[in-house]
Amino acid sequence: MKSLIVVPARYGSTRFAGKPLALINGVSMVRRTANVAQRAAQTLDNCDYVVATDDNRIAAHCQKYGLSVVMTPPDSPTGSDRALSAVKIYAQDTDFVVNLQGDAPFTPVSTIIAIIKALNEGAQVATPYTQLSWSALDKLREQKRQTPFSGTSVLIGQDNRALMFSKNIIPALRGEQALREQSPLSPICRHIGLYGYRLDVLERFVSWPESHYERLEGLEQLRLLENDVPVDCVRVEPPRIATSGIDTPEDIARAEALIAVHGDPFEGPI
């Protein structure tokens, strides 16, 4: 089965225009994310990657560094729509599509590999999560005091499929102190915004209108649940550099501070 990792990279952003070209420790964000996709594709059989953009500046930047890139329609409403457009332009014989968000430059290669493995094992849609330690949960709660819509939680059933995604921290924890004494891990699962689709499921997904809870939460994956598509959840280890993505210029400084502590995962000439 053939897989394609798509990195949607849109120039326009209300909070951070030109974000894909922003430098993090001297390397552009789109180049960092494409590097992750490229390394994952090189590790797997029958796998390729491509950057999908609507902007000539981003395309030229990718070409300068030898990165695969295609131009997609500027009116694509979501990264999933852009990913599907990339498949139709770049690799129509694709079976599985991985949507690696362009503002997630610190995604571990192992996470992408785990998602493609789940698709090969029969998942219609697969997405990763980490189970939070109590200290990580405390940090998430503090973060949400400043930015309430940062970070997404997922409820997972016994079949390892998603029951609900929310920008609230779910589930609520009654008797939390006792839970803290029982385990170093909290019951909270934090969703990582990476999606793997069977191509036919992605085609159906983008054809459906925005769903009720998707609109309320601002989470497009809820469209899948509201249309009865099972979403397999794949547990992964927390990344060495843990960020929610790069959404503002201030996030660049935070990312560079983390690089200074943990080292730079980028593989390639600066």
Language model segments and positions:
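Short phosphate-binding loop-to-helix
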Residues: N56-K117
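N-terminal glycine-rich phosphate-binding loop and ensuing alpha1 helix
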Residues: K2-T53
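Conserved alpha/beta core of the MobA/IspD/sugar-nucleotide pyrophosphorylase nucleotidyltransferase superfamily
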Residues: Q92, F165, A178-I270
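Short, high-confidence coil segments that cap the C-terminus of an alpha-helix
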Residues: N46, Q92-T94, E121-V125
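A short acidic, helix-capping loop that chelates divalent metal ions and anchors anionic groups
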Residues: S13-G18, A136-L137, R204, A242-T243
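Conserved core of the sugar-phosphate nucleotidyltransferase
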Residues: T107-W208
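Hydrophobic/aromatic residues located in beta-strands of well-ordered beta-sheets
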Residues: I5, D48-V51, V97, V125, ...
